[in-house]
Amino acid sequence: MDKKWDVVIIGGGLAGFVAANYLARNQLSILILEKNKKVGGRARTDHIRQQYFNLGPHALYKKSKAKSILEELNIQLSGKSPKKGGVLVKGNLEYTAPFTPIGLLNTSFLSWKERIEWAKVLLKVMSIQPEKLAQQTYEQWVQQTTRLANVQSLLYLLGRLSTYCHSPEKVSGMVVLLHLKAVMSGVLYLDKGWQTMIDQLHNNCVIFGGQVQTRKCIKQIVPIKQNHFKLVLSDDEVIYGKNVLSTVGPKELTQMLGEKSPFSQIDSFTKMESVMGATYDVALTQLPNPKKLFAMGIVEPIYFSVHSNYALLSDDAKNIVMHVFKYHNPNDNIDTKKVKSELEHFLEKIQAGWKNYEITSRFIPQITVNQRIPQIGDEQILQCSKNKIPGLYIAGDWASPDSILSEGAVTSGKQAAEEIIKKEKS
């Protein structure tokens, strides 16, 4: 007779492994199915020519639910926090970033009137209750908060930095402000990349009896009866489980459940858009300009940061690992050559002559950063999706009503696990 697992988890990324750790510790039989050769999802780190490349820039909020949950699971988080500051770029001009008291005094980007306004806005951000913005887009909140164009541009820039979202006219003001407050409290760059988190979660899961299978692509999820699911794989292998926890995106989940799925009836659920970007991950033997470690475009939605100054990201500690990233707007038509040229040009502005010191680099023109652009009303949509199919649970960076990125993945993974444990132990 085929084995029937207590929980089958679809996806071996951050959400899946966090859930698996809680479930396995509660003596439930766990099977994680990962479609790729390597586990980790977007938290994966690739070891390329002795350099550790995350899939673009990754930072963990220092004061966050995600960090607390990972520490609760005894995950060691080794690394340091980058200093606040850096430069802002507009055309060929550079300005001191007004993100510290000294930066605010020294920047030539803002007039004295704008500096006073900016200081007031930052204080407002730290004291605001984001939940009160549930019915506002980030753009609406910015325009209500200040009428000064330069101050608005700084808020849009910080919105991109904290959420990777370059669609202020769409994105929820509540979600952006929640993440912006977290960013302002500091972030952590991890030694040897985010794979270290995944490896620890993976090992702990296996120690507690969980099983992980890679290169397993789910073709169909079939609810047979109460507490009984059949999962059909692409090679027609069949796996049975009492509960299914899906950490794949909303569209992929809907496809797995088929046209008759209750999820297909939720129009907004199937039309959710992903947060996208382009990343240029670069390793150098040295920095042409060691003082420039962080930069962002004011008009150009581009980010640059040297991560290796705060985390060990090379087998040779002297080497430099940095990321250049472009935030895509959902309406962008992506021209791969043009995007790469933009990122290289931006990097050349900040680190002129960098190619002379290049060890290796990797350009990815379109990368999914988050599987949902968080919009007004998403909380109701996500709530509606709960209990549509008893025994089917969702988690992932898109599945939390008020969080995205690692915060959404980790918190939704724990919540789904707790719901399953409560059900199975009752």
Placement of each model-derived feature along the sequence:
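Glycine-rich FAD pyrophosphate-binding loop
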Residues: 25-47
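Dinucleotide-binding Rossmann-like beta1-alpha1 core, especially the glycine-rich loop
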Residues: 49-131, 144
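Rossmann-like flavin
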Residues: 106-176, 188
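Helical element adjacent to the flavin cofactor pocket in flavoenzyme catalytic cores
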Residues: 178-228
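Mid-domain catalytic core of redox enzymes
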Residues: 220-225, 229-320, 383
